[in-house]
């Protein structure tokens, strides 16, 4: 394990902050070379230039945005499984090492990732609605899952940074929040009622923000004059596994990983190395 990775891991104070507030913003972790490669990977993915297709994925089922959708908020799931430059970013051991420290986990595996592109412009429908990641992961046994949000460039207020409701992971926030909801006013009231702070994650290039799966988060419009470009890397502790669950409306809960990781008998294997590779500890 490289000394650089060890020295970059969160301190005890950082871990305590994360567990109290539900998020943590790292010092610079990633090199320009890795982020420049990720930018190339994003352009390739958006152009349909991929290194491989995902096994057991019905064509187009999980890919998300395509050029036919126009210049809107773009979200593409599983991008690192298709494009090598994005896999390089996801497999940076310092990301999973930080996640392991924050979650108190001996092992970290990829859950899935999302390539995110938010166009600039005040009239665009490009808010990311207030939501918790846990809302979409009801079939996961672990409550310690977390996300590393990796921007490819400096993020200032005008870019529409990720915003966290600090401490919301410790409360019952409900399950009716939605990623694509353009109304961000409801959580202002929620935060005021529970005496919680809303924090914006402004970062310099190379920094990463981490948040707990139950932390309420979202982002506002991008007014920077350039698209906001990033990768959300969703991570699971090694002991996470599939559980039967239902949505609030009573329907059976599921996740696209259920199909991608299905065993011969149909049950999902969230440790399938082809879809959910181990990222920490790093390979010898």
Language-model-derived ranges and their functions:
Residues 2-20, 27-130, 136-139, 177, ...:
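Non-heme Fe(II)-dependent double-stranded beta-helix
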Residues 16, 155-216:
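Double-stranded beta-helix
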Residues 122, 126-130, 140-141, 158-164, ...:
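A short secondary-structure junction signal
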Residues 138-157, 202-203, 210, 234-237:
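Short, conserved beta-strand element in jelly-roll/cupin
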């Amino acid at each position: 394990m490289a000394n650089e990775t060890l020295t970059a891991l969160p301190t005890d104070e950082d871990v305590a902050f994360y567990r109290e507030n539900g998020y943590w913003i790292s010092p610079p972790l990633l090199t320009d070379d890795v982020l420049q490669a990720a930018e190339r990977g994003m352009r390739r993915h958006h152009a349909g230039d991929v290194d491989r297709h995902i096994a057991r994925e019905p064509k187009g089922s999980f890919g998300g945005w395509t050029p036919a959708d126009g210049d809107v908020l773009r979200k593409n799931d599983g991008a690192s499984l298709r494009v090598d430059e994005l896999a390089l970013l996801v497999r940076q051991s310092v990301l999973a090492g930080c996640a392991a420290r924050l979650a108190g986990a001996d092992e970290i595996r990829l859950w899935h990732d999302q390539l995110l592109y938010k166009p600039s412009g005040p009239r665009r429908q490009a808010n990311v609605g207030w939501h918790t990641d846990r809302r979409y992961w009801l079939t996961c046994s672990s409550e310690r899952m977390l996300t590393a949000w990796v921007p490819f460039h400096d993020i200032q207020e005008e870019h529409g940074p990720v915003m966290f409701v600090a401490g919301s992971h410790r409360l019952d926030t409900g399950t009716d929040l939605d990623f694509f909801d353009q109304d961000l006013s409801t959580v202002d009231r929620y935060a005021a009622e529970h005496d919680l702070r809303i924090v914006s994650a402004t970062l310099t290039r190379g920094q990463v923000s981490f948040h707990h799966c139950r932390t309420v988060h979202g982002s506002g419009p991008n007014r920077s004059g350039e698209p906001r470009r990033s990768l959300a890397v969703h991570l699971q502790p090694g002991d996470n596994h599939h559980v039967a669950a239902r949505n609030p409306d009573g329907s059976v809960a599921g996740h696209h990983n259920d199909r991608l990781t299905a065993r011969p008998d149909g049950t999902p294997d969230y440790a399938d190395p082809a879809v959910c590779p181990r990222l920490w500890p790093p390979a010898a």
